[in-house]
């Protein structure tokens, strides 16, 4: 019913192989191993090999020899372990429960296209390194690294609290140290993900992004600086979610030397622009964005004329601006 896409309601496996060993299974001891698990799913997902060994007692649990292999991907998990006062304490996520580990390897996006079909055309693998540690209801990822020479350099860290649903709001902190996509990589991704990535993204040239995220599942603050060959954008935005799940955005957006002519494919009309505006209540109503806008366009080039210090105070709605200029 969904060719080429995984459907959890209609799972069909071929070439299924499993080799499992159970050396010890007692009230306070577990020693088991999945020596090999492999199959092909009709969506196209191909699990070449999944293997690990788990050893546990009343104080700790460790996983050894973890290996996940897909046609063009390999992931290993080093040193994943849990420590606790007793097996009975695990479900409560108290501070007695700690964990740590390191995920590394190489992932080819195409191998995951059964779950995300747009990845079908991206057959260049990227290296992955993810280090994590946790205590109770707090999980931190001090290091996240993704790298492919052609299209991606990504470095970040993150922490999450109260993720297990203990009645408190989930808290998230994340810092993006750097995401760099060279011009060649941006062209490659825009071509492979045509129809998914907006056309304007392919016109940016190269991309360098730094930013951070702070907040909860109802109020999230996002800040970032985007540097491109077509100008720079800096944003400081707060996302609010009401009890009905509706989202609205408010904050500041500024642009420096933004090449509107290139971005709009209309160099005869537009040149560069510098601006600093405040958005309040930004959201989508139908197909158009809607927001209160207040700020200053320091400079904008239009039809071979440069306009300076243009003030804006009004509302953008239904594809048009209504207010004072």
Positions of predicted regions on the chain:
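Interface amphipathic segments
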Residues: 1-16, 23-325
């Amino acid at each position: 019913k969904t060719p080429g896409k995984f459907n959890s309601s209609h799972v069909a496996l071929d070439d299924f192989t499993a080799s499992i060993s159970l050396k010890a299974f007692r009230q306070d001891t577990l020693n088991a191993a999945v020596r090999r698990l492999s199959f092909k799913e009709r969506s196209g997902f191909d699990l070449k090999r999944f293997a690990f060994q788990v050893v546990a007692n009343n104080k700790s649990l460790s996983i050894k020899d973890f290996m996940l292999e897909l046609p063009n991907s390999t992931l290993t998990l080093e040193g994943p372990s849990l420590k606790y006062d007793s097996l009975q304490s695990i479900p409560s996520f108290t501070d007695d429960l700690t964990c740590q580990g390191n995920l590394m390897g190489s992932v080819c996006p195409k191998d995951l296209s059964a779950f995300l079909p747009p990845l079908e055309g991206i057959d260049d693998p990227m290296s992955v390194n993810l280090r994590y540690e946790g205590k109770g209801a707090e999980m931190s990822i001090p290091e996240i690294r993704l790298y492919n020479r052609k299209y991606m350099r990504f470095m970040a860290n993150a922490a999450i609290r109260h993720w297990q649903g203990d009645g408190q709001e989930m808290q998230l902190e994340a810092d993006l140290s750097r995401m760099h996509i060279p011009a060649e990589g941006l062209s490659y991704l825009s071509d492979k993900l045509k129809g998914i990535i907006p056309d304007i993204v392919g016109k940016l040239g190269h991309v360098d992004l730094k930013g951070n995220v702070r907040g909860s599942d109802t109020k999230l603050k996002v800040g970032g600086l985007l540097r491109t060959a077509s100008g720079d954008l800096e944003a400081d935005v707060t996302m609010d979610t009401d009890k009905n799940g509706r989202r609205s955005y408010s904050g500041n957006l500024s642009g420096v030397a933004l090449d509107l002519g290139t971005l709009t494919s209309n160099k005869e009309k537009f040149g560069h622009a510098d601006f600093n505006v405040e958005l309040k209540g930004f959201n989508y109503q139908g197909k158009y964005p809607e927001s209160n806008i207040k700020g200053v366009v320091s400079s904008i080039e239009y039809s071979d004329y440069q306009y300076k210090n243009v003030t804006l105070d009004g509302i953008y709605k239904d594809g048009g601006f209504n207010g004072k200029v």
